[in-house]
Amino acid sequence: MNKWGVGLTFLLAATSVMAKDIQLLNVSYDPTRELYEQYNKAFSAHWKQQTGDNVVIRQSHGGSGKQATSVINGIEADVVTLALAYDVDAIAERGRIDKEWIKRLPDNSAPYTSTIVFLVRKGNPKQIHDWNDLIKPGVSVITPNPKSSGGARWNYLAAWGYALHHNNNDQAKAQDFVRALYKNVEVLDSGARGSTNTFVERGIGDVLIAWENEALLAANELGKDKFEIVTPSESILAEPTVSVVDKVVEKKGTKEVAEAYLKYLYSPEGQEIAAKNYYRPRDAEVAKKYENAFPKLKLFTIDEEFGGWTKAQKEHFANGGTFDQISKR
């Protein structure tokens, strides 16, 4: 072997030795399985190309509130990708995430958005067109439990906001409306994917209140001949949020790759993957490319209608809040 061949052999051997094997844990909310299965492959390839290191990302899924509790209780998540900011704040309150986490990434650390829509059976036999149809007698509604599910809290607040707008912002009338809606709920699963399975696989209910991405997944990939999506006249802008878990990445030495993992969600490839998985992308060019995939509707925000997540959580979902009040039979 000539000297160039020997040198190349040593170089390749040195590169092989220097390449690291890294493992991350992404603790996410219920219906993001398909999104992150695709995204993880793309990021791993990107990181390998950039650094030569091998990164494997493990996933954990469940109701967003339950997932936040698991991180608070010690599960060593490098990153969390949860349904709403309050759940990340809850982890930050326990000192595992920096309290200024929401400022670390663009768009308040929400790299994609969604909203809340209805999934009905083919032909829409109960003629469900808007939120007011969900309180009619004989309509069986499926939605998760707001005590454990982030999506369920978005569902609840979307209904509440609609009721406010149609009752001159009368909170008492909004509470009566939401109480009537939940009287029609047949099954309260712990997470959004569980509710989808109840509706789609078990055949229970006339209408599923769902994340838009979950409804599109069910309709487009599980049975266009079985289901239809109904987009209400208005709904809430749902903003799932992401953060590095500071205490864990500092302990494991994974901060650099964990931060890069979340930042890459904002890249053109990350945004494209989000859009293909039925999430509304933030990137203007990607959003324009997929604009026909997402119906236009009036969207209100958690800050506009409810004064932010801390206030909404306290008033509606804490012990003794409005959800507990309307749940009393």
From Swiss-Prot:
Gene Ontology BP term (one)? sulfur compound metabolic process
Q: Does the keyword Endoplasmic reticulum apply?
A: no
Instruction: Name the Gene Ontology molecular function terms of this record.
Output: molecular carrier activity; sulfate binding
Question: Keywords in UniProt for this one?
Answer: Periplasm, Signal, Sulfate transport, Transport
Q: Which residues form the signal peptide?
A: 1-19
Which signals induce this protein?
Repressed by sulfate or cysteine.
The Gene Ontology CC terms held by the record are: ATP-binding cassette (ABC) transporter complex, transmembrane substrate-binding subunit-containing; extracellular space; membrane; outer membrane-bounded periplasmic space
Q: Which InterPro entries match?
A: Sulphate/thiosulphate-bd_CS, Sulphate/thiosulphate_BS, Thiosulph/SO4-bd
- Predominant place of localization: periplasm
Q: Where in the cell is it found?
A: Periplasm
Q: Which family does it belong to?
A: Belongs to the prokaryotic sulfate-binding protein family.
What does the UniProt function comment say about this protein?
A: This protein specifically binds sulfate and is involved in its transmembrane transport.
Cross-referenced NCBIfam families: 3a0106s03 (TIGR00971), PRK10752.1 (NF008022), PRK10852.1 (NF008106)
Mind telling me what this protein is named?
Answer: Sulfate-binding protein
- What is this organism's lineage? Bacteria, Pseudomonadati, Pseudomonadota, Gammaproteobacteria, Enterobacterales
